[in-house]
Amino acid sequence: MSRIPIADPDIGERERERVADVLDSGQLADGPVVREFEDEFADYCGAAHGVATANGTAALQTALEAAGIGAGDTVVTTPLSFVSSANAIRLCGARPVFADIDERTYTLDPDAVEAIVAARDDVAAILPVHLYGLPAEMGRLADIAREYDLALIEDAAQAHGATYEGASVGTLGDAACFSFYPTKNMTTGEGGMVVTDDRGIADRAARFVNHGRADADEHGYQHVSVGHNLRLTSLAGGLGLAQLRKLPTYNARRRANAERLSAGLADVPEVTLPTEPAGRRHVYHQYTIRCTDRSALRSHLDDGGVDTAVYYPTLIPDQPAYDGFDPAVPTARRVVDEVVSLPVHPGLTDADVETVVAAVADHYGRPDAEVSADD
């Protein structure tokens, strides 16, 4: 029995050509193809500057460092995300403070954020995560950041091409961070990017990922600050350029698959479907439903050849590395036990989508659920 995977990276001839071009050039590390990728990805987002990084976690730490976040600061973020969202804060010497989430969108609840910010005098930044491909409530969060003079750093690792009120994620705060891990909406294998309209942040980020190097002397080895080696390779940059050309098509297919899944599951009341609030464009890095019998549903789908995943089974503050963090996040604690993601990637055929719908419906004793040919 062939299985329907939860993710299926699409690497084609154009990607192979781009990688071969880099190999032929002999510039395998931080070459001109990386500068080209930075420029094109920033332009895609509508941002002025792009700084490529080795991975998405590096992008987060780089953006925070470039925004001046460090020891003595706290950063408000979500408890429901991959652990890197909080790890990057701690790697800067700052401390994450976890605010609760909205029950419909699973992104930061602005009211919870404002309550924390108003009660503390050490908050320096807000780091919202555009979870599963849906932008957070950036209008309210931007208002809070302005009122309290805070940095606003977007974790857009799962949201390439998503928009909020017509503006692309990546342009909704002081800086934004993307990941190009293989399961993301586009991939470079491993890789990340910081995008920003702030030239100062861009310059500091570029130095931070390259040993604090300014290249201001005749030998090219002037280091004006302490940094890391977090550069993206040229091989990854070549992959990124090829993948970026396909991203609009990938996202359109993800959205079409999501619409068909939602249409087919609309009459299965045991599951809560993803939402797309007015003014926000979801790019469905994940199609995440909620149910109260997650293990049983996953087992049934596994028996039927449908892969699923849980993003994420444990809240960040409940991880062993976060012992001592005990935030009041009742909504997140309820949601974390119920979320499960179904296949939605662009490699799915219409028949695959129908199989997923049928398997979920069958588990709940609703075998008549189907995807309409008109959807």
Per-region residue spans from a language model:
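Helix C-cap/helix->beta junction micro-motif
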Residues: 92, 147-148, 304
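A short hydrophobic/small-residue beta-strand
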Residues: 75-76, 89, 96, 152, ...
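Generic structural signal for small/hydrophobic residues in well-ordered secondary structure
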Residues: 19, 41, 59, 75, ...
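Active-site phosphate-binding strand-loop segment of PLP-dependent enzymes
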Residues: 104-188, 193-195, 341
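Phosphate-binding glycine-rich loop
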Residues: 27-74, 88-91, 98-100, 167
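N-terminal "arm"/small-domain region of PLP-dependent enzymes with the aminotransferase-like
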Residues: 1-27, 32, 224, 304, ...
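Short beta-strand->loop structural element characteristic of the AMP-binding/adenylate-forming
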Residues: 95-105, 309-311
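PLP-dependent aminotransferase class I/II
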Residues: 47-48, 111, 125-128, 134, ...
